[in-house]
Curated annotation (Swiss-Prot):
Keywords: DNA damage, DNA repair, DNA replication, Ligase, Magnesium, Manganese, Metal-binding, NAD, Zinc. DNA ligase that catalyzes the formation of phosphodiester linkages between 5'-phosphoryl and 3'-hydroxyl groups in double-stranded DNA using NAD as a coenzyme and as the energy source for the reaction. It is essential for DNA replication and repair of damaged DNA. NAD(+) binds at D29, A30, E31, Y32, D33, S78, L79, E107, R130, E164, K278, K302. HAMAP family: DNA_ligase_A. This is DNA ligase. SUPFAM superfamilies: BRCT domain (SSF52113), DNA ligase/mRNA capping enzyme, catalytic domain (SSF56091), Nucleic acid-binding proteins (SSF50249), RuvA domain 2-like (SSF47781). It comes from Streptococcus thermophilus (strain ATCC BAA-250 / LMG 18311). The gene is ligA.
Length: 652
């Protein structure tokens, strides 16, 4: 049986390599599916024989508790940027002054997320994000769900490779269409979508989102002589490598390559934002070395933002959750960086005045950071109007008078009952970094608000499944799913609630700092300015903003309402004494608990000094196992890690 399972794993992995990496499948989808189903059946019957590189690991279904930090053995450096031919020539001159015969390899700069993969004896052991270059996050379970990443190499190598994880454009469109249908906020661009997917705690979502990769570096020591040799080796090992690259000693040829790539850029199946030029010889790379931040042997040419002319037809003034009124230009449609653009930001009223932008003007539009369409300037030679841009004096949402404070560039509505601010506040409250209510995106909030089912954030917790069935697009299953997401958000640690309240100057990081110090939102609400300002040196601007917010009667009423609905107001990871019983211990929770919710168990462990992580490793000190504990328990036992049950935790 073990022999047959190994045979199936080897065959399926080879077929997957042919399909995803080589684009040359040797078997039909039906044949692959038949073998895959056979393997699934055998693994269910013989779980003790499941192999580490089995393709069934890619399916997902595992929900992670979080991501552990990962110390990179080989640091990941940034690249020096270049924006002109002159800067490339200066780089070439610097290299050739020491190594006159050096040649270069130029390759596409994929607009994705850097990842590092480490293999031990040919088996994938760790997948990690770049992080700050020295410390990233361990995302091993997620990278296993990326179809073109080999779980096992053909050779038993100890190797670390680096690459870029990206979301193909077609997949990006599919996901955003699905999110729109589900009432969820759409991703701004493929890079953001890839980043969000890599940090998903639900591996099933990762598997469903069809991420892809291109690898470009062997970080561990290699016997290869050139960068091009490294890429050939990496490709032979089964990794995806971008075929579009050149090797030359001529900067003229590299510049021609850059121009050709720039022309093709919008027609590629993935996003790129430039071309990377590296000294091809690894020996010369070693001689040139590094600065503090970047290698001296490489440079990244960044494409300039594409610019197009469009006519400014009208301006919409939109109110954000803090009352800032932002102008958005309606334009004649233009093709820009692969998409049709008919709206672009005008930033603020001061920007309009400074650039003297008028209705009817021909303007230059570009994508800031290749993401957000923005108006850059006016083509004055094509101006046909003499009238200045009309600037509103009243809020377009509630009609209240707008203010333009001396120290601000924007108009602001200060009416707390402004419908637009309330709606935007609800969207913010439900967002991922705040209460993370899955399924409550802008379109759902709009429907709830229009149906007068919610007027403030506390109203969210008074909703039930029947309320959602009143809304267009909801069926019983989707209504129950959203209701469950709302109920689950009650158990969030209170820093997410604090951030969700939308207090000016209080972001996600500040919210956590405050709750770590004060423990509960109630304690924070009653604190004086000096006490708040003293927290990690936050200062008086933030402290006064918080005090002003909680001094209002409606804020006090809101806290009471949230508490009455069972929303947690306490920080679930409070600081503990150094001599706490589990101080310094790394603990993993696994299985189903009978008496404690998982969030309660985690909070209790943290209160006793433990660091609670989502995966078992040699660094794990203790595993608390409930019923139906699976692979984590097995791994703990194989590593000789101490295992306790829920009763032990309750007795502490």
């Amino acid at each position: 049986m073990e022999k047959r399972m190994k045979e199936l794993v080897d065959k399926l992995n080879q077929y997957a390599k042919e399909y995803y990496t080589e684009d040359n499948p040797s078997v039909s989808d039906a044949e692959y599916d038949k073998l895959y189903r056979e393997l699934v059946t055998l693994e269910a019957e013989h779980p003790e024989l499941v192999q580490a590189d089995s393709p069934t690991h890619r399916v997902g279904g595992l929900v992670l508790d979080g991501f552990e930090k990962y110390q990179h053995e080989y640091p990941l450096y940034s690249l020096q940027d270049a924006f002109s031919r002159e800067e490339l020539d200066a780089f070439d001159k610097r290299v050739k002054s020491e190594f006159p015969n050096a040649d270069y390899m130029a390759e596409l700069k994929i607009d994705g997320l850097s990842i590092s993969l480490t293999y031990v004896d040919g088996i994938l052991q760790v997948g990690a994000t770049r992080g700050d270059g020295s410390v990233g996050e361990n995302i091993t379970e997620n990278v296993k769900r990326i179809s073109d990443i080999p779980l096992k190499l053909d050779q038993p190598l100890n190797i670390t490779v680096r690459g870029e994880c990206y979301l193909p454009r077609a997949e990006f469109e599919r996901i955003n269409t699905q999110r729109q249908e589900n009432g969820e906020a759409e991703f701004a661009n493929p890079r953001n979508a890839a980043a969000g997917t890599l940090r998903q705690l639900d591996t099933k979502v990762v598997a469903e989102r069809r991420l892809a990769t291109f690898f470009y570096q062997e970080a561990s020591p290699t016997e290869r002589l050139t960068q091009n040799d490294v890429l050939n080796e990496v490709a032979e090992l089964g990794f995806s490598v971008n075929p579009r690259r050149i090797v030359t000693s001529s900067m003229d040829e590299i510049w021609d390559f850059i121009q050709a790539v720039g022309q093709d850029r919008d027609h590629l199946a993935y996003d790129i934002d430039g071309v990377v030029i590296k000294v091809n010889s690894l020996a010369i790379q070693e001689e040139l070395g590094f600065t503090v931040k970047a290698p001296r042997w490489a440079i990244a040419y960044k494409f300039p933002a594409e610019e197009k002319e469009a006519k400014l037809l009208s301006v919409d003034w939109q109110v954000g959750r803090t009352g800032v009124v932002t102008p958005t230009a309606n334009l004649t449609p233009v093709q820009l960086a692969g998409t049709t653009v008919s709206r672009a930001t005008l930033h603020n009223v001061d920007y309009i005045t400074e650039k003297d932008i008028r209705i009817g003007d021909t303007v230059i539009v570009y994508k800031a950071g290749d993401i957000i369409p923005a108006v850059l300037r006016v083509v004055e030679s094509k101006r046909t109007t003499q009238e200045a841009m009309p600037v509103p004096s009243q809020c377009p949402s509630c009609g209240s008078g707008l203010l333009h404070f001396e120290d601000e560039v924007a108009l602001r509505c200060i009416n707390p009952s402004c419908p637009a601010q309330i709606k935007e506040g609800l969207i913010h409250f439900a967002s991922r970094d705040a209460m993370n209510i899955s399924g409550m995106g802008p379109s759902v909030v709009e429907k709830l608000f229009k149906a007068e089912l919610v007027k403030e954030v506390a109203d969210i917790y008074g909703l039930n499944s029947q309320d959602f069935l009143q809304l267009e697009g909801f069926k019983e299953k989707s209504a129950e799913k959203l209701y469950a997401a709302i109920q689950a958000s009650k158990e969030n640690s209170a820093e997410k609630l604090l951030y969700g309240l939308g207090i000016r100057h209080v972001g996600a990081k500040v919210s956590k700092q405050l709750l770590e110090s004060f423990g509960t939102i109630k304690e924070l609400a009653s604190a004086d300015v000096q006490a708040i300002a003293a927290v990690d040196g936050l200062g008086e601007v933030i402290a006064k903003s918080i005090q002003r917010y909680f001094a209002k009667e409606e804020a006090q009423v809101l806290l009471k309402e949230l508490e009455s609905y069972g929303v947690n107001l306490s920080y679930l990871g409070q600081k503990v004494a150094d001599d706490a019983i589990l101080s310094g211990k790394t603990v993993v929770l696994t299985g189903k608990l009978e008496h404690l919710k998982r969030s309660e168990a985690k909070a209790k462990l943290e209160a006793l000094g433990a660091k609670v992580t989502g995966s078992v490793s040699k660094k794990t000190d203790l595993v608390v196992a409930g019923s139906d504990a699976g692979s984590k328990l097995e791994k703990a036992q194989s590593l000789g890690i101490e295992v306790k049950d829920e009763a032990w935790l309750l007795d502490l």
